């Protein structure tokens, strides 16, 4: 066998492996998309005759003809918005401190990083138990209110926001800050004017995805007194509330078949909200990326 034959054989083997790998990736993507669209089609097929204005403007009810999701939608908006207001600034500033100002390798930083990584993997129901013991009852005693639920969801998404923000800040080329420091800028000026704006695309995308996770949570809120049927919209952090995932669960667990279709409609509404948040994250990332390039 000549060297040319050996080279051709190796080239053919590589092409086969490359084609096999590409085929496997394509099949995996198609399988994932097929599953997602299959779920969406199933929900649409069950609820297409219910997707009217009434399903959004009506309050939850034991009468399937007048049942809707107005208070769960407003409750989810209240809870998730307050959680984002609390978690996002704290998470981004913590990530900024750990990446730019904390001492590398000291014991405090290592302990803090380890705990943040561990908290990111804690089940949501554990955060609910902590909130029940220390926020709804216990030292704070806020009761079963929107504020209690928002604080628990903020604790739940905070580690994710910190980790994503750190990765985004770490991805900024070091030459940006080094150039600013060489021109006489202070470390804070370099971070505020160069590092932080350059990390906005990744930070914003990760933060919105973390908020999307909070939007779909129900387990911790079950422990915090979220009601199943609320016929009023929350008016502030001290109001009682319900959320969209919990209302969907309540309708789906009813023995009457009509409520199962209503639960499918609620699931489709939740998916639309989550897809909208993901779309906002993509558009915001693209906009900030183009702005930084200019």
Where are these regions (language model features)?
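Periplasmic/extracellular loop-to-transmembrane helix junction in inner-membrane transport proteins
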Residues: 3-24, 42-83, 105-106, 250-261
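Transmembrane-helix boundary motif in ABC transporter permease subunits
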Residues: 83-116, 129-132, 137, 282-290
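Membrane-embedded alpha-helices of multi-pass transport/permease systems
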Residues: 34-37, 41, 89-96, 126-129, ...
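Interhelical loop and adjacent transmembrane-helix boundary motif
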Residues: 60-63, 67, 221-271
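Generic hydrophobic transmembrane alpha-helix motif, especially the helices
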Residues: 117-157
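Transmembrane alpha-helices
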Residues: 84, 164, 187-225
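C-terminal transmembrane helix and the adjacent membrane-cytosol boundary/short C-terminal tail
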Residues: 98, 166, 170, 174, ...
